[in-house]
C-alpha cells in the first residue's frame, strides 16, 4: 500500500535531495525510511512542571505506533511553561504568550522539515490550544494526544488546595507546619492538575472536537491506557494520511458546537471561551463569544467536578471517562453526530457501542437532574463590558451580586489587600490593566481568588478583571472584560466606592454611575506607558487582539 507523502517527498526524493538524506541517516533513518510518510511528533516534554515530565515517554510510544503502521516518526520538542508555578508572579504574563509560541514552533518545524502528518502531545494548560492552533494552521493530517491527569494528593488535595491554604494560613486557621504539609503532599507526580481545570477542560473539548482518539481526555497520566492511547494515535495518523483527512475537515462549526456543549456539561473553565475562539480562528471558523450563550441556553451542567464540585478527574476516569457523558448528550440531540473525527469515523459511530455509567456513580448526573439547568459560562455585557466579559457562575454563588468597588491596577496589590484583611463583605474587587495588551499577557487570578476562599469570603465578595482566571478558580468572578482598561475601557475609570452589579441571570455587568460622570472620567484618563517595550511580551502586546476575539496574534 502506497501511503501519500505530499510533503516529505519534496525533501528526500531525487538525486538532488542527497544532502537532505545525508542529514537524516545520523538521526536513525534507514534507506527504506525515505519512501515512508514522515510524521512529526510534537512533544511538550519538560522538567519545568509535573504536567509534562512524562511526555517524552509518551512521545516514544507514539513513535512506535507510527513506525509499526508503516510511517517514520520523528520526535521534536516545543516549549511549555507552568501556570501553577508562575501564578501570582510577573512570570504569569508569559503564560498566554506560550500558547502562541507553541503554535508558531509546531508550524515552523513541520513546515521546515516537510512532515506529512503530526501527532502533538500536550499536558499543561496552554499546550492544548497551542498545539491545535498549530495543527489547524498547517492543515496536514494530525492528531492531538492528551498527556493525562494527575492522581489526587493526600486527603484528595491538589495544587488549588495549596493556593487556598495560603489564605487559611493568613487567616490563622492553619499553622506553618500544616501549610508545609499540604505543600509537600498535594501534588503527587506526573500529570495535569486534577480537577475540571483548564487542562482537563481543553483536553475534553479537543476530544469532543474530534481531534483526539476516544477517551484520550480521560486517562491517568501514568497508565497502560495512556501508553496505548499514544501507540494507537501513531497508528491512526496513517489512516488519516491514507484518507487525506485534515484538521479543517474535522474542525468545523458543528464540531466547535460539540466542544462547547461538552465543556458546559462538564462545568469547564472560562479559558475554554478564549481558547476555542482562538482555535476556530486558526481553522477559519467564525466562532464568536455569543455562540457560547446560544448553546448554553440548552445545555445543563451535569458533572460534579472540582473546583466548584466534589470530584477529581481521576475519579471520572474510574467510572468510564467522558465517553458515556458524550453518548448521553448525543442521545439527547445535543451533539452533532455526523462530525468527522481522527478515527476516520463520525462521532456517532465512535459512540455507538459506549456503555452508560453505572447507576451507583454520583459524579455525572442525569440530564433531567442537573446541577445547573443551563450553562455556567455566562457572557456578560453592559457599560463595563461593551464587547463582552466571561463569568463562571455555577449557581452556588447565587445569580447576582451588587457591591462597592475596591480598585487595583495589578494583581499583586489585590492579593496583598486580601491577605491583609482590607477586603470586606460586599466589596467588588476590581483588578485592571491585566488584559492581553495592558498586562501584557492576560494573567490568571488564581492567587487572589484562592486567597478569597481561604479567607472565608467566598460568596461574600465578587472579583472582576480584564485578566483571566485559572480553571481552578471558583466563586463570583468575571474576567475577559472588553474593552480592557489599557485600551480605554470603562474598567479604567471605576473608582473605589462605585456600585457595580453583576447579574448572571440577565447577563449584565454594569457600573452604576451616571453616563455623564463616566464620560467626564474617560475624558481625563490617559493611557499608561507599556510595561514592556522589547522582547516577546512587547511583541505580544502589539499583535494581540481582544479577549473577545481569543487574544489571537494573527
Curated annotation (Swiss-Prot):
The modification N6-carboxylysine is found at residue 126. Mg(2+) binds at residues 83, 125-126, 444. It holds the Pfam family ILV_EDD_C. GO terms for biological process: isoleucine biosynthetic process; L-valine biosynthetic process. It comes from the Bacteria. Its cofactor is [2Fe-2S] cluster; Mg(2+). It catalyses: (2R)-2,3-dihydroxy-3-methylbutanoate = 3-methyl-2-oxobutanoate + H2O; (2R,3R)-2,3-dihydroxy-3-methylpentanoate = (S)-3-methyl-2-oxopentanoate + H2O. Keywords: 2Fe-2S, Amino-acid biosynthesis, Branched-chain amino acid biosynthesis, Iron, Iron-sulfur, Lyase, Magnesium, Metal-binding. GO terms for molecular function: 2 iron, 2 sulfur cluster binding; dihydroxy-acid dehydratase activity; magnesium ion binding. Pathway: Amino-acid biosynthesis; L-isoleucine biosynthesis; L-isoleucine from 2-oxobutanoate: step 3/4; Amino-acid biosynthesis; L-valine biosynthesis; L-valine from pyruvate: step 3/4. Its EC number is 4.2.1.9. The keyword Membrane does not apply. The keyword Cell membrane does not apply. The active site is at residue 470. [2Fe-2S] cluster binds at residues 51, 124, 193. Binds 1 [2Fe-2S] cluster per subunit. This cluster acts as a Lewis acid cofactor. HAMAP family: IlvD. Homodimer. Functions in the biosynthesis of branched-chain amino acids. Catalyzes the dehydration of (2R,3R)-2,3-dihydroxy-3-methylpentanoate (2,3-dihydroxy-3-methylvalerate) into 2-oxo-3-methylpentanoate (2-oxo-3-methylvalerate) and of (2R)-2,3-dihydroxy-3-methylbutanoate (2,3-dihydroxyisovalerate) into 2-oxo-3-methylbutanoate (2-oxoisovalerate), the penultimate precursor to L-isoleucine and L-valine, respectively. Belongs to the IlvD/Edd family. This is Dihydroxy-acid dehydratase. It comes from Vesicomyosocius okutanii subsp. Calyptogena okutanii (strain HA).
Amino acid at each position: 500500500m502506497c501511503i501519500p507523502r505530499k510533503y516529505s517527498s519534496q525533501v528526500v526524493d531525487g538525486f538532488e535531495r542527497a544532502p537532505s538524506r545525508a542529514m537524516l541517516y545520523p538521526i536513525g533513518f534507514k534507506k527504506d525510511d525515505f519512501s515512508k510518510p514522515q510524521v512529526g511528533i510534537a512533544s511538550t516534554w519538560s522538567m519545568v512542571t509535573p504536567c509534562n515530565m512524562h511526555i517524552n515517554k509518551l512521545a516514544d510510544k507514539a513513535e512506535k505506533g507510527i513506525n509499526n503502521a508503516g510511517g517514520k516518526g520523528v520526535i521534536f520538542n516545543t516549549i511549555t511553561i507552568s501556570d501553577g508555578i508562575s501564578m501570582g508572579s510577573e512570570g504569569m504574563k508569559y503564560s498566554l504568550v506560550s500558547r502562541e509560541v507553541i503554535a508558531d514552533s509546531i508550524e515552523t518545524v513541520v513546515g521546515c522539515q516537510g512532515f506529512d502528518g503530526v501527532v502533538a502531545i500536550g499536558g499543561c494548560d496552554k499546550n492544548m490550544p497551542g498545539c491545535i492552533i498549530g495543527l489547524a494552521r498547517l492543515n496536514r493530517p494530525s492528531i492531538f494526544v492528551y498527556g493525562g491527569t494527575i492522581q489526587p494528593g493526600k486527603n484528595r488535595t491538589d495544587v488549588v488546595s495549596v493556593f487556598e491554604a495560603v489564605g487559611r494560613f493568613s487567616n490563622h486557621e492553619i499553622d506553618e507546619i500544616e501549610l508545609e504539609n499540604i505543600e509537600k503532599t498535594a501534588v503527587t507526580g506526573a500529570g495535569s492538575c486534577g480537577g475540571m481545570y483548564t487542562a482537563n477542560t481543553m483536553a475534553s473539548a479537543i476530544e469532543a472536537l474530534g481531534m483526539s482518539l476516544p477517551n484520550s481526555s480521560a486517562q491517568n497520566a501514568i497508565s497502560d491506557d495512556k501508553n496505548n492511547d499514544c501507540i494507537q494515535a501513531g497508528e491512526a495518523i496513517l489512516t488519516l494520511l491514507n484518507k487525506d483527512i485534515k484538521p479543517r475537515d474535522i474542525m468545523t462549526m458543528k464540531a466547535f458546537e460539540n466542544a462547547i456543549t461538552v465543556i458546559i456539561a462538564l462545568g469547564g473553565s472560562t479559558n475554554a471561551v478564549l481558547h476555542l475562539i482562538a482555535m476556530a480562528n486558526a481553522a477559519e471558523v467564525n466562532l464568536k463569544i455569543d455562540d457560547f450563550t446560544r448553546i448554553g441556553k440548552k445545555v445543563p451542567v451535569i458533572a460534579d467536578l472540582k473546583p466548584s464540585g466534589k470530584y477529581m478527574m481521576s475519579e471520572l476516569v474510574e467510572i468510564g471517562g467522558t465517553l458515556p457523558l458524550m453518548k448521553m448528550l448525543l442521545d439527547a440531540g445535543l451533539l452533532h453526530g455526523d462530525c468527522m473525527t481522527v478515527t476516520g469515523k463520525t462521532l456517532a459511530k465512535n459512540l455507538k457501542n459506549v456503555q452508560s455509567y453505572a447507576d451507583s456513580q454520583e459524579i455525572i448526573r442525569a440530564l433531567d437532574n442537573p446541577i445547573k439547568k443551563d450553562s455556567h459560562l455566562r457572557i456578560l455585557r453592559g457599560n463595563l463590558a461593551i464587547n463582552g466579559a466571561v463569568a463562571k457562575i455555577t449557581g452556588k454563588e447565587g445569580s447576582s451580586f451588587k457591591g462597592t468597588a475596591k480598585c487595583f491596577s495589578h494583581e499583586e496589590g489585590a492579593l496583598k489587600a486580601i491577605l491583609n484583611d482590607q477586603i470586606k463583605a460586599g466589596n467588588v474587587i476590581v483588578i485592571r490593566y491585566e488584559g492581553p495588551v495592558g498586562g501584557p499577557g492576560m494573567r490568571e487570578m488564581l492567587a487572589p481568588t484562592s486567597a478569597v476562599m481561604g479567607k472565608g469570603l467566598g460568596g461574600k465578595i465578587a472579583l472582576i478583571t480584564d485578566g483571566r482566571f485559572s480553571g481552578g478558580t471558583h466563586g463570583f468572578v468575571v474576567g475577559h472584560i472588553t474593552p480592557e482598561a489599557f485600551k480605554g475601557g470603562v474598567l479604567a475609570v471605576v473608582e473605589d466606592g462605585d456600585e457595580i452589579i453583576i447579574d448572571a441571570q440577565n447577563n449584565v455587568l454594569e457600573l452604576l454611575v451616571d453616563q455623564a460622570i463616566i464620560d467626564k472620567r474617560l475624558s481625563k484618563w490617559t493611557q499608561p506607558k507599556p510595561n514592556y517595550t522589547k522582547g516577546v511580551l512587547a511583541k505580544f502586546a502589539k499583535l494581540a487582539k481582544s479577549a473577545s476575539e481569543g487574544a489571537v496574534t494573527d
